Amino acid sequence: MSDADSLSCSLTLESDEYDEEEYDTNLSKLLENKTLNWIFVGGKGGVGKTTTSCSIAVQLAKRRESVLLLSTDPAHNTSDAFNQKFTNQPTLINSFDNLYCMEIDTTYSENTAFKLNKTEFFDNIIPELLQSFPGIDEALCFAELMQSIKNMKYSVIVFDTAPTGHTLRLLAFPELLKKALGYLINLREKLKGTLNMLKSFTNNEMELEGIYEKINHLNAMSISIQSNFQNPLKTTFVCVCIPEFLSVYETERLIQELTKKNISCYNIVVNQVVFPLDSMTVDVAHCEGLLKQIKDKQVQESFSSLVQKTKELEDVYISRRKLQSKYLTQIKNLYGNDFHIVCMPQLKSEIRGLQNISNFSEMLLESKEIPIYR
């Protein structure tokens, strides 16, 4: 059975067990939670993660003493969102005195601002470690990054993450570090006698002790980071999606992985939702009656063309609503009992600039019924 078929089956099964009792359909509880230190915002590419994370940060700035919006997405759309250039250093966002933003690269690089203080001996160990634990280079860089972030004195940090696959790797780094560093610590114990003998023949005793100290420090750091990740009072994840198959599928995959890693997740933001209009249908019979009353042929043709175009637009609108309703129903059935599901409307233009972000952020506080087409 394919992954798509599996998801379809799970959706059908969940639908039969759906209870009408639901969580609030806004982010008020998230924003009012004073214990949270880290809020991760993630999902499939192109679903509005940056807009959502920026909006959450703007609302938090009204409630918390100091807020940092941190982009770990290589695309770094936060600068475009606020029309302001950000770097790998916290920069105050225009018009705020307590909201900062920074854009960092979580991939391993000699040029990264958060790199390990390496030695020649450490350089010799790393290649062996890389072969045994692929991805440990990025994990080490991530550990240094998270430790630096942890030492920053912000009330809360909002992470604008990369698309799902990259984010899942990022969240797996603490466990990878724990395994790799545990391997090194065990190796040290096994080779303790040999290493002590080597000390008497070399001048590297201080260097060896420095490396062991660094490894123990990194191990303690990875345990601390993992503990923070798994503490629902300190860390939570906000999933962002749109009502389309691939996005809903990736959201399910993301939530399953977060559950496996014991990371709290109880909010889903569904963007680009087409809500019902006040009047959804064109009264064709009435329009045809009006058409017969028009004597001027040119006006009659123009009116007829207008009615036809309106009808075509209505057909597209209804088709779009029906398609979205299929996935909104699945989202409701899968997550309605355990998540705050916030539906955000399809807007006329992209969200750029502080005013537009602020307007969007206010909508996150509004309770809106999930618009299922009947």
UniProtKB/Swiss-Prot annotation:
EC number assigned by the record: 3.6.-.-
CDD domains assigned to the protein according to its UniProt record, in alphabetical order: ArsA
UniProt keyword annotations, A-Z: ATP-binding, Cytoplasm, Endoplasmic reticulum, Hydrolase, Nucleotide-binding, Transport
Subunit and partners: Homodimer.
Organism from which the protein derives: Plasmodium vivax (strain Salvador I)
Presence of the UniProt keyword Transport in the record: yes
Protein family according to the UniProt entry: Belongs to the arsA ATPase family.
Cell compartments where the protein resides: Cytoplasm; Endoplasmic reticulum
Highest taxon, organism lineage: Eukaryota
Annotated PANTHER family: ARSENICAL PUMP-DRIVING ATPASE ARSENITE-TRANSLOCATING ATPASE, ATPASE GET3
Entry annotation: catalytic residues: 73
Root EC class: hydrolase
Gene Ontology biological process terms from the UniProt entry: tail-anchored membrane protein insertion into ER membrane
GO molecular function: ATP binding; ATP hydrolysis activity
Residues forming coiled coils: none
Protein name: ATPase ASNA1 homolog
Role of this protein: ATPase required for the post-translational delivery of tail-anchored (TA) proteins to the endoplasmic reticulum. Recognizes and selectively binds the transmembrane domain of TA proteins in the cytosol. This complex then targets to the endoplasmic reticulum by membrane-bound receptors, where the tail-anchored protein is released for insertion. This process is regulated by ATP binding and hydrolysis. ATP binding drives the homodimer towards the closed dimer state, facilitating recognition of newly synthesized TA membrane proteins. ATP hydrolysis is required for insertion.
